[in-house]
Regions:
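Generic recognition of stable, solvent-exposed alpha-helical segments in well-folded globular domains
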Residues: 52, 56-59, 128, 152, ...
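Terminal peptide-recognition signature
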Residues: 21, 26, 86, 104, ...
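Glycine-rich phosphate/ribose-binding loops and adjacent secondary-structure elements
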Residues: 55-58, 67, 71-73, 79-200
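C-terminal extensions of enzymes
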Residues: 38-42, 201-276
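Single conserved hydrophobic/aromatic residue that forms the stacking wall/gate
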Residues: 1-15, 19-20
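Glycine- and acidic
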Residues: 43-46, 51, 111-117, 226-229
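Predominant activation on well-ordered alpha-helical scaffold segments within soluble catalytic domains
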Residues: 58, 62, 127, 131-134, ...
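Non-catalytic, usually N-terminal nucleic-acid engagement modules in DNA/RNA processing proteins
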Residues: 16-18, 22-78, 191-194
Length: 276
């Protein structure tokens, strides 16, 4: 895109990437996991378009699998053990999602992702789709929920069989002074933290909480000092990683339901207290 006064002129150059070039780029990056080429239709797209989109994604996946096998066989490939994950799509149409899950499950991939969620639909719609789709994905392969989400979203996803997640929330929200705690999300830009000498979270072992107060981090944010954003991001990443450790421990101990209930009650209590 090229900016011209107050309008934007769209370049006529073809910026799209085909299946093989996508695989080659990921192979050269030598990532542990490569994601198959897919199309993510809008959550409000009409049914006919979504069906055509999903059919196209299925064809692309077959090509991706063949190309990844070829790349992994080459002598100069960096990571010959690179894994390939297929991506389930279908917007908010349960039946299309389920049929697509069945189709890609037959391809015997290394893992499976659920994509196209957290793109405008409600949390309830997202959970409805997960309830419908996850049972049709191989139970002996890892399942990845793409682009999700809040701590509560993660707890709901794990309960429905999701194994891992990725999301910009910890870093993006941290850059805006929003930090996650056991009692919900805090906005350190709020004036009530101006003289608050407590750490972001009592008992937290992250560098931000060990060495800095809410008031000082707020001062850094207000002064547009990069350190303020960095400290918020550090805390959020620590919070998310620590929560995932606790989730794994709860699953191993067989008490995830109790852990989830405790966590959600803490988040809800924080919402109530923040309004007082």
């Amino acid at each position: 895109f090229f900016k011209q006064k107050t309008a934007y002129e769209i370049s006529t150059r073809d910026w799209s990437s085909d299946v093989c070039s996508s695989d080659l780029i990921q192979s050269n990056l030598a990532s542990t996991i490569a994601m198959a080429f897919d199309e993510c239709p809008s959550s409000v797209a009409d049914r006919d378009y979504v069906q055509k989109s999903v059919d196209r994604t299925t064809r692309w996946l077959a090509r991706c699998k063949a190309e990844m096998a070829r790349l992994n066989s080459l002598p100069d490939t960096i990571n010959k053990e690179q894994l390939l994950f297929g991506i389930n799509q279908g917007a908010v149409y349960e039946d299309i999602r389920i049929e697509h899950a069945k189709a890609i499950s037959e391809m015997d991939l290394d893992g499976y992702a659920v994509g196209g969620l957290a793109v405008g639909e409600t949390h309830e719609e997202m959970y409805r789709i997960l309830d419908a789709v996850v049972p049709y994905l191989p139970q002996n392969k890892p399942t990845y929920l793409m682009g999700v989400g809040t701590p509560a979203n993660i707890l709901e996803g794990v309960e429905r069989g999701i194994d891992f997640f990725d999301c910009v929330y910890p870093s993006r929200n941290g850059r805006h002074g929003h930090v996650y705690t056991n009692h919900g999300k805090m906005n350190l830009f709020n004036a009530k933290y101006e003289l608050d000498t407590r750490p972001i979270e009592e008992g937290c072992q992250c560098p931000a909480c060990q060495h800095y107060s809410r008031a000082y981090i707020r001062h850094l944010l207000k002064a547009k000092e990069m350190l303020g954003m960095r400290l918020c991001v550090l805390h959020n990443l620590y919070f998310y990683n620590h929560m995932m450790e606790e989730i794994r421990d709860a699953l191993d101990a067989g008490n995830f339901a109790e852990y989830k209930k405790m966590r959600l009650e803490g988040f809800e209590e924080g919402k109530i207290n923040s309004k007082r």
